[in-house]
């Protein structure tokens, strides 16, 4: 795996890091189970374990570096995965408003090393309900997804595949109460990034 990454570094320096991670199957399964049985709110966030210590160097006998390639500089590592937090439009950004938005699940995780996911939205049409919120089934909610790039939009209900659409927008109608969340995939990316999630949303809870 390391040599695959080294080989692809020159042409695809950012995508090279995709050799070292995969869809977090076990974590997502545990999260889905925790938010479904019984239905309860549990917010997903993500961050980077950045050390800038992956690379190749050639030193002389005195230990002086002759050639060095840093594969994971901090400016690249900190773009691998991000938590995008949604705060009310026009409100002042503060520590308190940031923590409140995160605690409410008004956020989503994205692998921005693939593409900047700013502008993603998962909400209920004709309402103020966004990811992290709940809504009653008898209100006949329509779930709406918007992405900044054309993508494969997958909706997951209670941890199971519910449906998918292609494009920058998608609409899904819940078939019952449950925990609904979104995963988005950039299928046009080459391996090893192909098949890896680009965006993982927090759920909307339909009661």
Regions found by a protein language model. Give the residues of each.
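Histidine/acidic residue-rich metal-binding segments in metalloenzymes
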Residues: 5-9, 22-39, 43
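Non-membrane alpha-helical structural segments and their capping/turn regions in soluble enzymes
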Residues: 21, 25, 96-99
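Second-shell loop/turn segments in exported
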Residues: 16-21, 86-88
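A solvent-exposed, charged loop/short amphipathic helix patch at secondary-structure junctions
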Residues: 1-19
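C-terminal functional module detector
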Residues: 36-207
């Amino acid at each position: 795996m390391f040599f695959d990454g080294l080989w692809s570094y020159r042409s695809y320096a950012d995508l090279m890091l995709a050799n070292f991670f995969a869809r977090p199957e076990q974590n997502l399964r545990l999260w889905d189970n925790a938010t479904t049985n019984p239905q309860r709110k549990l917010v997903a966030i993500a961050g980077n374990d950045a050390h800038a210590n992956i690379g190749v160097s050639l030193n002389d006998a005195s230990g002086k570096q002759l050639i060095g390639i840093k594969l994971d500089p901090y400016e690249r590592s900190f773009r691998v995965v991000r938590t995008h937090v949604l705060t009310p439009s026009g409100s002042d950004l503060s520590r308190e408003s940031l923590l409140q938005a995160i605690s409410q699940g008004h956020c989503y995780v994205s692998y921005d090393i693939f593409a900047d996911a700013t502008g993603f939205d998962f909400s209920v049409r004709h309402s103020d309900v966004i990811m992290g919120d709940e809504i009653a089934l008898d209100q006949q909610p329509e779930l709406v997804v918007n992405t900044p790039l054309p993508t494969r939009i997958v909706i997951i209900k209670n941890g199971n595949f519910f449906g998918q659409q292609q494009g920058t927008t998608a609409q899904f109608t819940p078939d019952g109460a449950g925990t609904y969340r979104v995963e988005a995939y950039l299928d046009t990316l080459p391996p090893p990034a192909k098949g890896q999630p680009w965006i993982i949303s927090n759920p909307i809870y339909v009661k």
